[in-house]
């Protein structure tokens, strides 16, 4: 599962997830990409589920890049615990996604196969996505 090795602080504040992705919004490593069209939070487990779906569909061919990283800790208090007594412990890690962010990239496979693989990964994602190709200048 993806998570940071070390962080300066164990817990973070909530913060708002607004605006569009100005970085990481173009296909830069592979030929095809899966781009988010809505905003949300993707957990480390969802990222891994998407990666597995893609790699199992393309079998041995091609190369996959994961373009997002879960660097935000989400805390939870245990069940049936009264309010107060401080912030809960870190339960899982998420990546905050803005519209336009490229989530995965693939190279070395045909376009049809890439579309099918990304469709399987998109079914695991909590955000709407679209298929994009590398823009050649």
Curated annotation (Swiss-Prot):
Record-linked PROSITE patterns: RIBOSOMAL_L16_1, RIBOSOMAL_L16_2
Keyword Ribosomal protein: yes
Sample GO molecular function, one term: tRNA binding
Keyword Transmembrane included in the entry's annotation: no
Xref: InterPro entries: Ribosomal_uL16 (IPR047873), Ribosomal_uL16_bact-type (IPR000114), Ribosomal_uL16_CS (IPR020798), Ribosomal_uL16_dom (IPR016180), Ribosomal_uL16_sf (IPR036920)
Record-level GO cellular component terms: cytosolic large ribosomal subunit
Keywords: Ribonucleoprotein, Ribosomal protein, RNA-binding, rRNA-binding, tRNA-binding
SUPFAM superfamilies the UniProt entry points to: Ribosomal protein L16p/L10e
GO biological process terms on file: translation
Coiled-coil ranges from the UniProt annotation: none
Subunit structure and binding partners: Part of the 50S ribosomal subunit.
Function text: Binds 23S rRNA and is also seen to make contacts with the A and possibly P site tRNAs.
Protein family according to the UniProt entry: Belongs to the universal ribosomal protein uL16 family.
Designated name of the protein: Large ribosomal subunit protein uL16
Organism listed in the record: Francisella tularensis subsp. tularensis (strain SCHU S4 / Schu 4)
């Amino acid at each position: 599962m993806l998570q940071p090795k070390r962080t300066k602080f164990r817990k973070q504040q909530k913060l708002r997830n607004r605006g569009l992705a100005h970085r990481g919004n173009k296909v830069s490593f592979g030929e095809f990409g899966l781009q988010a069209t809505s905003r949300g939070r993707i957990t480390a487990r969802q990222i891994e589920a998407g990666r597995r779906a893609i790699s199992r569909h393309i079998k041995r061919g091609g190369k996959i890049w994961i373009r997002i990283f879960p660097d935000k800790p989400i805390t939870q208090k245990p069940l049936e615990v009264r309010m107060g007594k401080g912030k809960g412990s870190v339960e899982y890690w998420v990546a905050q996604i803005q519209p336009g962010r490229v989530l995965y990239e693939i190279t070395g496979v045909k376009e049809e196969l890439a579309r099918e693989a990304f469709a399987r990964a998109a079914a695991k994602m909590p955000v709407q996505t679209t298929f994009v190709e590398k823009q050649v200048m």
